[in-house]
């Protein structure tokens, strides 16, 4: 599937469709699961609407570890079936979103002591890696490797040599989670779905017989009545606060938010060329350090969270936890002031309180209420396609229709005909745009050809250009400064302070492209800068 012109989703047209059309399926929640469900249903030929109260991927789906993997620890938990299935889904994503999903080497150092595991357990760990390869890791085209001490240091020169004896490397994949989610939503629109971000569902409606028949949506100061044969709640951890059921009805599923944080550090302080797994001293835990552009991001944590789901931040305590592990494993004295960005989000685990969240299985659950409301929650980024398939299968039973799933081999926008090896090898602007837009990169290049001044960088020290902001406004449903700097680009994670300085210019471009008022632009810039400052104050620990 290759578009000959850039997809343009006009907001006014989408809102008019929400109020004027009757849909087979209304999906609430614009994270990766909801976006994949919208694509799945659209490809089956259904009339689909997807609404999101904030921005696409503004919740958990932009704050993951950005890994598309089977998960070695799921083998350790005995969940081999999840690993097999995840590795199969990984390869489907590697094909269908080949411009976004890249191979990611994982390095496990072997230590005499004080490591993720010691030398005595190395043989057992290698058996685990063989199990991983046989479960589906081989589909990546390369099996795990045993490394010498020198080879480990060649991949991460700053690793602490004390007690290091060697290591193992195996191969998975990574993705810009926010761009994947956005691309899924845009591909759904390409196939006919109606999309609206910044559109909040205020109420799930029911007919005289008590059956779900749509929702009331608030967007741009108006109230829109959306009619649909079935409503799917795909709101992730937000199901904890509101799940669309009527007052008095028992909750369908028990959601347990588990908070995870990552912090970004200048890559030159680490100099890793792969994901390095490190121990956290005295915690029986491990963390990872992954290179992404000019930063390496360090994570993650896994703890219960009962706070405000719309305002989740990395705290000083969590930062110290991660830096303690990094300082122990590396010959680099990382300090809080070295951190250039952070993300914090919550995983939507399914289950009751009790026990450690890190030990809970990452399975998903789908529920069909007696009134026809369908709910999906749980799972993980890697298995989102399969979760969506099962969700639409369930929704079909509500509306009494049946059509086969087509997403197993469906290319996302930008993937068909894209040659990642050739584009990345070319380097420079072509490689940067290729890894973000795939074959759609030519549309961004067209903007630059028409107006060369758009090649100007938008954020100091990062490769994003003004052309990408224009493209985000015209073709990627960006409505705010935060949409652009946090998700259409990843400037807030990679260069928090520089992104705040770029906010006024982003606001001016959005004003010109979207016709925003001076007052609204000023408000967006002010809110973004304030949010960045608050994030920083919580991280450093001086927020009172």
Task: Enumerate the language-model features and the residues they cover.
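Glycine-rich FAD pyrophosphate-binding loop
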Residues: 42-64
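Flavin (primarily FAD) binding-site architecture
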Residues: 233-248
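Glycine-rich Rossmann-fold phosphate-binding loop(s) that bind the pyrophosphate
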Residues: 29-31, 53
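Extreme N-terminal leader/targeting segments of oxidoreductases
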Residues: 1-25, 40-44
